[in-house]
Amino acid sequence: MKKVAIILARGGSKRIPNKNIKSFLDQPIISYSIRAAISSQLFDEVIVSTDCEKIKKVAESYGAKVPFLRSSINSNDHATTVDALFEVLNFYKSKNKIFDLATCIYACAPFITSSLLIKSYEILKTNNSDSVFPVMAYSHPIQRALK
C-alpha cells in the first residue's frame, strides 16, 4: 500500500504573515508536522504543498519533498483543502504514481506527533474506515476558550 502525507502550507496568511515558518519553541512551526510524518515511518513520501519559495526551502531542509509550487488558483483565500490535496494527487497521477492512502496534515500543527499519526492509521485499519479526523470535546461554550 502506497501512502503519502500531504502537508498544506500556503504562504498567503493575512492574519499572521509567514505563519507556517514562524518560530515556535525555536523551530519553524512547519517542522513539527514534517518531523512527525517522517518519524512515523508510515509514509512513502512526505510532501509539502505550498505556493511560497521560503516555505519550500524550510520544508526541504527538514526532509519533505516539494515537487512543485502550488498554483495560484489553489493558493488564494477561497481555495479549499480538498482542491489543494487533489492538485498534489493529480500531479503524481500525471507521473503514473498513485497512492492508496493520503493523509492531510496542516503545517501549523506543532502538537502533532508520530504516535498520533500511527494511532490514527491503526484506527483507520482496524475499523475498516475510509477517514479519520481528530476532534476534541470542550465542556463550555467555545467562545470561553478565547481571550
Kindly give the residue locations of the regions a language model identified.
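Short coil-to-beta-strand
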Residues: 1-6, 57, 61
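N-terminal glycine-rich phosphate-binding loop and ensuing alpha1 helix
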Residues: 2-49
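Conserved acidic residues
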Residues: 3-4, 44, 65, 100, ...
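Cofactor-binding loop segments of dinucleotide-utilizing enzymes, especially the Rossmann-like FAD-
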Residues: 8-10, 51, 107, 136
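Short clusters of hydrophobic/aromatic residues that line enzyme substrate/ligand-binding pockets
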Residues: 16, 21, 67, 74, ...
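Residues at the C-termini of beta-strands that transition into short coil/loop
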Residues: 25, 70-71, 135
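Conserved N-terminal catalytic core of the sugar/cofactor nucleotidyltransferase
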Residues: 33-98
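Conserved beta-loop-beta/alpha segment of the NTase-like Rossmann-fold superfamily
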Residues: 74-147
